[in-house]
């Protein structure tokens, strides 16, 4: 029960980018309290770290809020390079974590490997389906992918930016050429295109052509 509430709160916090939305835990008996104290949630970042002002940071803030709500302590470990991923996840397994959040598609292979080897641990991966064999399901039953259609939020941003612009020109830029990055810019462009179509305008997008 505690684990389910924590997962719900984590998902809500990541999606809203501000706060956990899980229900507050009910007053518990001594036995339930002991069960809660045995629950150890953990999180590992990708190479961006938890101060990236993006999905690593938002995931960390969501997991922290959920852990606080449940009265438990979040164990976190940051990666600085891709070579850190496997060792960091293994360290959380050794730490006795019951649930491990892996942030970003770059940790997909490591998550699948660790989840397969540790079926009693729950894994939550952010922004990846953990579906290496493309059968429409995560490659281990104990993996819960959290995927969000971020193009929808970017669409609204593009539409509003186009309406706000006095110069008739708006810009966007991304980091590396990854699908989880370009999806933001795709949605932004679609919002501008929709604004132009419905308002009869010709606001120009600089920095991304959708290709």
Regions found by a protein language model. Name each.
Residues 11-12:
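Repetitive helical segments and hydrophobic/amphipathic motifs
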Residues 23-211:
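A residue-level marker of the well-folded mature domains of exported/periplasmic proteins
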Residues 15-20:
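C-terminal motif of bacterial Sec signal peptides marking the signal peptidase cleavage site
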Residues 1-8:
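Bacterial N-terminal signal peptides that target proteins for export
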